[in-house]
Structure formats: structure tokens, C-alpha cells
Amino acid sequence: MTVLIHVLGSDIPHHNRTVLRFFNDALAATSEHAREFMVVGKDDGLSDSCPALSVQFFPGKKSLAEAVIAKAKANRQQRFFFHGQFNPTLWLALLSGGIKPSQFFWHIWGADLYELSSGLRYKLFYPLRRLAQKRVGCVFATRGDLSFFAKTHPKVRGELLYFPTRMDPSLNTMANDRQREGKMTILVGNSGDRSNDHIAALRAVHQQFGDTVKVVVPMGYPPNNEAYIEEVRQAGLELFSEENLQILSEKLEFDAYLALLRQCDLGYFIFARQQGIGTLCLLIQAGIPCVLNRENPFWQDMTEQHLPVLFTTDDLNEDIVREAQRQLASVDKNTIAFFSPNYLQGWQRVLAIAAGEVA
């Protein structure tokens, strides 16, 4: 049997590193279909830190796409597992037959499913991408994203799968020991990316709570984002006193980020698509409820796991937040499907599907 090849078709270092390390640590030892990778970006020590994997790096999207297409044409039994899919050349290859549907298995990452970019180049490309998506052999995604995708592509097979968020299962019960009282701290957004719509989110928080809460805005990623960070800071200071606004402009190490999240009482995410699942998982693990946009389909995954969900359209106050905290504290977090290690079973299943080992 031909070994499955995994493709990380865009240079997104933090996600690519997470995926490679997850496969190296959790999957490669038990499946030959979890070892071969083609990646856009620099090695930067990844090969050394992932010795169980065979990783080929490419300088750009086009060079990787050309190599994938060549392999697909040379052997029509060769199957590819695309992690996220921000590579237009690969979509066009699927549409034109360079890559066959039986070779194309796609793990949907939030941003590459939704058509939110306003640039003309993207607007022109989206219709072609929709046509190509009809030809995908199978998609893997969250429950909400599967539902969203099925509305336009009902004939494409879909299987439930969660991004491998870095988590320590031993912390699942830690939140129950913490007493929450006094001024609330609200986390706004999961990064400095503009998709978080920070200014609108800050205005929404202020409308609900006024200047009675402390707002923390993590903006240490992506790099070279100083102008936007300052824009958010100025908008925030028009709404909140300086002591109630904390803009984090430096990237935090994981343990420091975890400690920051555990000081919060509420997460507030205004984006209208699935993103930031890693941050949501860490907040839920810490017993901290989240406010989501009703257009963000991840609420379906949360309710399926019997987790309380608050919406940006709800009338929120401290009593409602504290009640959501109490509800969350009563949930057995060891049973949540999108938590580690529970998502591992899903990965083992989809690897077998993509490799053709199971129907």
C-alpha cells in the first residue's frame, strides 16, 4: 500500500509546528501513514525535534504545489492529507484533474472554509474554490464546520475531527479550586490577527459591562503588528480606563499564556467563523465560559458536549457569567471530545480513512 502523504501547504509556523509535533509524539509510532510530510516554510529545527517524521520543506506555496501535483500524476494510488488549505494552486489542480478526488483528503481549518477576504483577487478565486471543494474525497472538521460545509457541498463525505490543541489533561480539575469574585477580567480575542475584530469586540464588551471590568487583549501574534496594536490600544482607551485595559504586545510562552487565561472570568470572541479553538479549549479547561458570535458554528460542538454557551447578542451581566461558570464547573472535562487526549481517537480513524484502510 502507498503511504499517505501529509501536506501543510502554507507557511503558518505556529500551526505547522503544532501539527508536526503532534504527529511525531502521538501518531507516528503506531501508523506508517502518520510519518510523511511536505511543508511550506523553513526547517528551523523541526526535523531535529520530530525525528519520527520524514519532512520535506519547500520555499513557497507554488513549489510545494508543483511537487504534490507531480506525485499525484505519477501515481494515482497516492493519497494526500491536506491540513488546512491556503494554497490556490492545489485547489486549481483538484478542479482541473491534476489531483483526483480519490487522492484529496482535507482537514478544514476555520479560516480557509469561510469567504471573508474582501480583496478582488480573493473575490475572483472563491467561486473556483467552491467548485473544487465539490471534488474533495472527504473532509474532516468540527461539527459546526461540517454543518456549514454540507450546506453547499452535501454530497461530499465529512468526518468529525478536532485540531490537536496542546493541553495537559491533568489540569482538567484545576479550575474547581479557584474562587471567582470581585471585578471580572475578560479576555478579548485569541491573537492580534485582525480577524478578531478587536475594536468592535471592545465596544461590545463596554456596551455590556461599561468600565467596570478589566479587559485583556493578547496581541503578541502575528509579528510586526505594531500599527494595528496601537490602533486597538487607542480605541480601547476611549472606552476603558488605563487600569482596566491590558494590551499584550509581546508573544507569551505557553505556560505564561496559560497562567494569563486562568486569571480571566470570561472569554469574548466576536468573530463570525470557527477559529481560536485552542484558546477556547484552554479557557473551558480552566472553567472559564466563552461568549461567541451566533454565526460561529463552533457553538454546535460546545452544546453537543453539554457546555454552556453565551452569545454576543445576549444581555450579559455578572450574575449570568457566574452562573455559566457554575454550570461549567459541573461538567466532567475528561469526557469533552475536543480535549486531549480524546481527540486522538478521531485522528486514528481519519488516518485510516484517508489511507484507504477503512471505508
Curated annotation (Swiss-Prot):
Q: Which organism is it from?
A: Shigella boydii serotype 4 (strain Sb227)
Q: Which family does it belong to?
A: Belongs to the glycosyltransferase 56 family.
Molecular function (Gene Ontology), one example: fucosyltransferase activity
Q: Which UniProt keywords apply?
A: Cell inner membrane, Cell membrane, Glycosyltransferase, Membrane, Transferase
Protein's name according to its UniProt entry: TDP-N-acetylfucosamine:lipid II N-acetylfucosaminyltransferase
Q: Which GO terms describe its cellular component?
A: plasma membrane
The record's InterPro entries line, in alphabetical order, gives: WecF
| Pathway stated in the Swiss-Prot or TrEMBL entry | Bacterial outer membrane biogenesis; enterobacterial common antigen biosynthesis
Entry EC number(s): 2.4.1.325
For the keyword RNA-binding, the answer is no
Task: Identify the main location.
Answer: membrane
According to its UniProt entry, the function of this protein is described as:
Catalyzes the synthesis of Und-PP-GlcNAc-ManNAcA-Fuc4NAc (Lipid III), the third lipid-linked intermediate involved in ECA synthesis.
Coiled-coil ranges per UniProt: none
Per the record, the domain of life is Bacteria
Which reaction(s) does the protein catalyse, per the Swiss-Prot or TrEMBL entry? beta-D-ManNAcA-(1->4)-alpha-D-GlcNAc-di-trans,octa-cis-undecaprenyl diphosphate + dTDP-4-acetamido-4,6-dideoxy-alpha-D-galactose = alpha-D-FucNAc4-(1->4)-beta-D-ManNAcA-(1->4)-D-GlcNAc-undecaprenyl diphosphate + dTDP + H(+)
Q: Name one Pfam family in it.
A: Glyco_transf_56
Cell compartments where the protein resides? Cell inner membrane
Any one Gene Ontology BP term: enterobacterial common antigen biosynthetic process
- Name the encoding gene, please: wecF
Q: What is the lineage of its organism?
A: Bacteria, Pseudomonadati, Pseudomonadota, Gammaproteobacteria, Enterobacterales
Give the membrane topology, semicolon-separated if more than one. Answer: Peripheral membrane protein
